Amino acid sequence: MALPEFSMRQLLEAGVHFGHQTQRWNPRMGPFIYGARNGIHIMDLTQTVPMLDQALQAIRDTVAKGGSILFVGTKRQAQQPIADAAEKCAQYYMNHRWLGGTLTNWQTVSQSINRLKAIDEQSERGFEGLTKKERLGMERDQGKLQASLGGIREMGGRPDLIFVIDVKKEALAVAEANKLGIPVVAVVDTNCAPDGIDYIIPGNDDASRAISLYCDLAARAALDGMSAQLGAAGVDLGAMEEAPVEEAVAAEAPAEEAQA
């Protein structure tokens, strides 16, 4: 595998260049704005392209060194793409609501994760020994904990990098990462400040197509990092029983060509 490729045309078709209304802009994003059209700021994609590439390289390198990525996006249109991307590359995500202290107070959060795991174990046994009322209470707690913590239940500790959609909405996540020195890759729209973002991706953080594109590219970069990590360890990713689908297919293709 290689770092995922993308074109300016793809970015244009996904609407990455569309910012917010000009009166809602943040002057700190001025250097990344090309101009305005019909009262809407237009992003300078000649800057977005190399900056997105640098961000993907950071994701790839983090995973290649054995690090973990936390995908963060809790706005409605980001929730599914964030979860899909993280699951695709065996990383972690938070897409329901950012819980204060997720990074800075991991010990407390891990206690909640342990409670979720304990309830899951009881659920597998049919909540035996509990009354109907107690079972309903457990199921309610299970649903809430799964929504909030399901994406990080196997993370085991703080991530090595976070990938964020909408830095204004996820300001708390960015602040916690900054406090701990965890690098931040983030899509930054024209109404946001790029402060505290290590790898800025100037772009539309509202359009579903744009969000899906960012998430897909980030997942593919992480998969490339995983491939590099396993390759360095002498592991044939395609031969692994639990290998991600993309790698398994890529590994089988040369064999099929050889038989042809």
Swiss-Prot record:
GO MF annotation terms: structural constituent of ribosome
Which top-rank group of organisms is this from?
Bacteria
One BP annotation, GO: translation
Gene3D superfamilies in alphabetical order: Glucose-6-phosphate isomerase like protein, domain 1, Helix hairpin bin
* CDD domains noted in UniProt: RPS2
**One family name in Pfam for this protein:** Ribosomal_S2
Record GO cellular component, one term: cytosolic small ribosomal subunit
Task: Name the UniProt key words of this record, in alphabetical order.
Answer: Ribonucleoprotein, Ribosomal protein
PROSITE patterns in the cross-refs: RIBOSOMAL_S2_1, RIBOSOMAL_S2_2
Q: Which family does it belong to?
A: Belongs to the universal ribosomal protein uS2 family.
NCBIfam families from the UniProt entry: rpsB_bact
Q: What is this protein called?
A: Small ribosomal subunit protein uS2
Question: Which species is this UniProt entry from?
Answer: Roseobacter denitrificans (strain ATCC 33942 / OCh 114)
